[in-house]
Amino acid sequence: MLACNCIEPQWPADELLMKYQYISDFFIALAYFSIPLELIYFVKKSAVFPYRWVLVQFGAFIVLCGATHLINLWTFSIHSRTVAMVMTTAKVLTAVVSCATALMLVHIIPDLLSVKTRELFLKNKAAELDREMGLIRTQEETGRHVRMLTHEIRSTLDRHTILKTTLVELGRTLALEECALWMPTRTGLELQLSYTLRQQNPVGYTVPIHLPVINQVFSSNRAVKISANSPVAKLRQLAGRHIPGEVVAVRVPLLHLSNFQINDWPELSTKRYALMVLMLPSDSARQWHVHELELVEVVADQVAVALSHAAILEESMRARDLLMEQNIALDLARREAETAIRARNDFLAVMNHEMRTPMHAIIALSSLLQETELTAEQRLMVETILRSSNLLATLINDVLDLSRLEDGSLQLEIATFNLHSVFREVHNMIKPVASIKRLSVTLNIAADLPMYAIGDEKRLMQTILNVVGNAVKFSKEGSISITAFVAKSESLRDFRAPDFFPVQSDNHFYLRVQVKDSGSGINPQDIPKLFTKFAQTQALATRNSGGSGLGLAICKRFVNLMEGHIWIESEGLGKGCTATFIVKLGFPERSNESKLPFAPKLQANHVQTNFPGLKVLVMDDNGVSRSVTKGLLAHLGCDVTAVSLIDELLHVISQEHKVVFMDVSMPGIDGYELAVRIHEKFTKRHERPVLVALTGSIDKITKENCMRVGVDGVILKPVSVDKMRSVLSELLEHRVLFEAM
């Protein structure tokens, strides 16, 4: 037998077993070869795989294992030495790779186990995230319900609608069996069932506010679970049900107590609460969840805010209604006052005109009589009539001035005037009256008193005359001194005038006038009465000298208009008085002092006494007034033509007439239209006569209307001979004369 490299089997081969081994090795090899292919495929598909070199070793191990099984197919039969060598090599390589792979797995397995741990961690994290997402969804759902409820609650500002809407929306959102609101009573000692969801409860039922369960709820700002058997939770009859639903209660802060009529509480600053009770359905396993309790708490806060807003709105509406009622009442009172003022002013205007017309006749005729040959007794009688008439005319002026001062229609006429001349004129006017009573009157003008000032000359002179006139009136003998000087800053503030706040400036100064007399004096407690209308103190009344009339009351108002104040001082009866007032006057501009619009008044010895041949026209609808004015002018030598109608005047007027006196306040006759027609007739100014309004109306509108239509002067009735003489002199010299009103 020839030698060979074959390995002889030790036991006889069983063909069936050999066949099964052969088939098994084939499929094992096939599986071993397919596994690396699958690994390679899925590794390529995977973006991240950290153990590629381990995979190479593991793939080599599997391939070599498959190769050994594949080579083993040829070992079941007689095979050559080559096959045996290949088989041996494959097994050696397989052993090496297997050992290397086993050693490598020692390092890999912990990583794989950590991967598993991370997997479990991620699963737990995912579960936690799921729970958080569920919580977030629950919170979002709660927030949605809160927004919906808040919108419904705030859709109205009626508190009853707010509370009813709250119960309905909470009942619908939380599927409640019952929901109720307990409000505090007026005494604050009980809670009253005010609103319920199902309207099946005895609204008005009360429970004591100091119950432990109520104190428990009021002491917490959270929703509190309470027993279904507590008095505030017995809202529904169980009707055979044995398991009542869970009940929670929450406090509702009452941010505005007055809206709920609980003003009888001793401490309104203490916080007070209403109680909201919510009940889940009976015979139900449902329980309150945290997010539902949070929803209830938020809604309670929103209800508190909405109730506060509603209360504020209700109060503002009540205040608005009250204000509207007050405005209506004030408007009615204002209209009534305006009607009364208009009626008073109309009455005063009519009375002024009607009284000045006869007064004009009395004074004019008395002054005419005074210039005739009279006996001493007759002259005394005429002078008495004239003085009484002048006093009555002054009183009429005072009444009208006071009326205009009170209704605010009188305004100061600001102009530049000679301040020293005002005092000298007052002194000259008062001296003859004082000399009759053997009173000496002295005038002291400080050296630093400005010669010119800016202010209302007429009102200042009227104030000085009234104050000095009172001093003369209540002094039987002795002396009267008038002192005028610039008030220093330290002497301006006075405790008697707390509302007087003088302000120093380079543009104005404060004039201080002091009138001191040695007359009857006055009790200090009677001094405030002197500035009231027709004041008459006991001391004055006993001397038959009458009261202070309107003079001081008007002076006080004039002084206030001139931003000053006035006061009177006296040490008592028989010790004389000192009247002092301060007024604000302006400085004229230094550059214009040489051009001051001031014309000194004509002195008595410079006034023309007669006007022979001066042609004058007089128009007046009142026959007495027309005759008196004509008589005055005729006494002064004028050639007078008197008419009563406009057409008659327009017919007789000519260039020969130098002056036209006309009453512009005649009933049924428009004196202003007459002035316009005269201007149309005489287009050239030097051909037109001087137009003078002789009127009894002293209002400012009359003067403005006269100036508007081109009237050259306005003279107030009554007019005496001396006044008419000075008026004509002024008109002929300046062709303009507007008497101050």
Swiss-Prot record:
Modified how: Activation probably requires a transfer of a phosphate group between a His in the transmitter domain and an Asp of the receiver domain.
GO CC annotations, alphabetized: endoplasmic reticulum membrane
Domain Histidine kinase intervals: 350-589
Listed transmembrane segments: 23-43, 53-73, 92-112
Gene3D superfamilies xref list: 1.10.287.130, 3.30.450.40, 3.40.50.2300, Histidine kinase-like ATPase, C-terminal domain
Catalysed reactions, as listed in the record: ATP + protein L-histidine = ADP + protein N-phospho-L-histidine
Modification sites for Phosphohistidine: H353
Entry binding sites for Cu cation: C65, H69
A molecular function GO annotation: ethylene receptor activity
Cofactor binding note of this UniProt entry: Binds 1 copper ion per dimer.
Keyword Oxidoreductase: no
Root EC class: transferase
Pfam families: ETR1_N, GAF, HATPase_c, HisKA, Response_reg
Name under which the protein is recorded: Ethylene receptor
Natural source organism: Malus domestica
Gene name as annotated: ETR1
